[in-house]
Amino acid sequence: MAFAMRPEWKDEPVSTTGASYVEPSATDLIKPGRRVAHLFPRSVMEEYVLQRVTERVWWVSRHFYGSLFYVGTRGVLLLDPFLGGADATVKAVASVTDLPVTAVVYSHFHADHVGGARRLFELLASAPPRVIASENTAIWMERFGSDLPWPTDVLEWPSGSLSFEDVTLRLRGLPRPGHAPDHAVFLLEEERVGHSADLINIDQLPFGGFAGQDPLVLFKPNLEFARSLEFDWFCGGHGNIGEKSDFDFYLTYLDEVAGLVNEYVPRPEVVPDLSLTDYLGGLDEASRSRLLTGLDNHFGLYLYGRQIAAGHPPAGGGGNPFMSGTIGEWATERKEAVDAAVPRIIERLRPTYGRMYNFDDAQPGNVRLMAMAIQPSLTNR
């Protein structure tokens, strides 16, 4: 039965790629240029959303998280057992096959995407699946001392692979991981389907904070790398099921935002040398001696040095040691310029993007982040 929208609910956002919305189907393959309809209210109201992607691959979504599973001839390969979704995912798998889940892939070691493995293994206790992950993920889990099921099959970074029945699972580590040190794309090669959680939100504007991409200036190269890979369909761990057109949209949007940032808050032509210790050279001997009387380390000097040198007692708390003196003054000036520019940039974006998913809620912060990311600072200039 078709999902029924209610008059009092907010209208569905428009597609970022101009896609047509269709009811999800566990039997019919989704066609190019189509996306699953009413995904946000479905995520609130329904147990899970299931869409067939290829003859052997399904996309499953629950509570704003998404993953893929491949149905072989002897078992099922599941990519990302996201937190809170194990029972629903097992139910979704069982709705299309009687075969058991025999292998699980961790896309990266963030518990919201793989933390459901604990519950999944409880459900599959009679025949626990193997766990596949990159060596970067395996090392990180070991160092952290994770209590999640550990990888049994470790893929060499950045491009290891293994066979799961008739499909090749290929790791393609991102060239400049910013979201996590093990951030990667996984490909089901013969099916031409890709998966990378937290790289792109399909059919949505970028998530608030760009999902923690850091440094933000390296986000675009990672998107370009992922787009260059061989796939027809892609799961981003959040949002809809999508295609390369979703990557094209992201790249275009980032370029447009960057262009507006450079228009409204360009880098100043003259940037001072930003230093935490620029004042030391101008101190007399008594002031230097006062510093050595009150301090025995340069972290403390960053916190309190200017106050002590001026003859004042150190202020409680100390603030951010890397925002003292001229650096703090510079950062405050640039932040004020960015804060003034963001509302104007948002209104320039609104005619094209204003009806898209999370425009008013997430994009002001994203524009601010992008603007600050290109400003010279202590570490970048």
Task: Put a short name on every predicted segment.
Residues 78-81, 102-110, 132-136, 194-197, ...:
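Active-site neighborhood of phospho(di)ester-bond hydrolases with catalytic His/Asp-centered motifs
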Residues 217-293:
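Divalent-metal (often Zn2+) His-rich catalytic cores of metallo-beta-lactamase-fold enzymes
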Residues 6, 91-163, 260:
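Active-site HxH/HxHxD metal-binding segment of metal-dependent hydrolases
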Residues 2-19, 274-381:
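C-terminal regulatory/interaction regions
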Residues 86, 109-116, 138-141, 179-182, ...:
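Active-site environment of divalent metal-dependent phosphoester hydrolases
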Residues 46-92, 185-198:
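Conserved beta-strand hairpin/beta-sheet module of binuclear metal-dependent hydrolase folds
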